[in-house]
Amino acid sequence: MLNIDLTGKRAFVAGVADDGGFGFAIAKQLAEAGATVSVGTWPPAYGIFTKLIQLGKIKNSLVLARGGDLKFERIFPFDADFDTMADVPAEIRENRRYKEHSDYTIQGVADLFVKEFGEKPLDIVVHSLANGPEVKKPLLETSRKGYLAAVSASSYSFVSLARSFGPLLRPNGAFLNLTYLAAERVVPGYGGGMSSAKAALESDTRTLSFEVGRKYGARVNSISAGAWASRAASAIGFIEKMVEFSRRNSPLGQSIEPLEVGNAAAFLLSPLASGITGSVVYVDKGMNVMATPVEV
């Protein structure tokens, strides 16, 4: 029997703040395969997420099919907008949701991994992060500040993650990020520079597959996930319509489930995918192949 076995592997999933998104599903399926999992949570959501766990509000979501419950090794406050604390503006440092944490930057969390778990503590790093403050604006109406903020948070953050966490990976490590079809097709309403950010993320995946592969011996891949009405995606404003559109028009006539993205991620991050790097893998019920809606 061919099984995905991640026993003895340690993973970090950046971008988990509830139990409803792809990041949580990936973390859970990595744990199902035997990995030890830590997550990074946006500081303003950190207290809420940790309380949800402590109070048992998401206990059903933590139940593993193999038995037992998902227990995160660590939940790190994590803001991928900042590489180091020197990059954090004073108004953020003094914000009550940030000031209780000593370091929540990309390099800071990488350093904490080494401090707590020693040299080369990781095997898997997942980037499940995106933010576009002007996502509801058409590209023509997007400000320079909003556009650059989308690219910084949604794509450059992966470059920074690879730079800071690459040295922490043990042999045959793997990186993974999440993209969306808007990187290559027009999705009206998905604005604010987010389509550009996803296109950059996919391009960076290819470039980093070479650079990270040669420097750290690690693989770098991307999953292009179908539309899903997560709490984070609700910021787009029309996500429910996109989910229904995908259900009606995908080759399988279904909408995606987070578990399916989690399963694909577990495979891509496992030794079974040792020959796959620099790839964008579609997990969208085949929506990416459709040129027109079913009913034109």
Residue ranges and their predicted role:
Residues 51-150, 167, 183, 189-190, ...:
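Conserved mid-core segment of classical short-chain dehydrogenase/reductases
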Residues 266, 277-296:
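Short C-terminal tail/terminal secondary-structure segment
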Residues 54-55, 192, 215, 222-251, ...:
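A glycine/serine/threonine-rich, flexible loop-to-helix segment
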Residues 219-229, 269, 282-284:
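Conserved SDR Rossmann-fold cofactor-binding beta-strand/turn motif
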Residues 15-24, 42, 130-215, 224-230, ...:
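Catalytic loop of short-chain dehydrogenase/reductase
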Residues 3-47:
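Canonical Rossmann dinucleotide-binding motif of NAD(H)/NADP(H)-dependent dehydrogenases/reductases
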Residues 101-104, 250-261, 272:
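A conserved structural motif in NAD(P)-dependent oxidoreductases
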Residues 217-219, 276-278:
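Short, small/polar-rich loop/turn modules that mediate ligand/substrate recognition or access, typified
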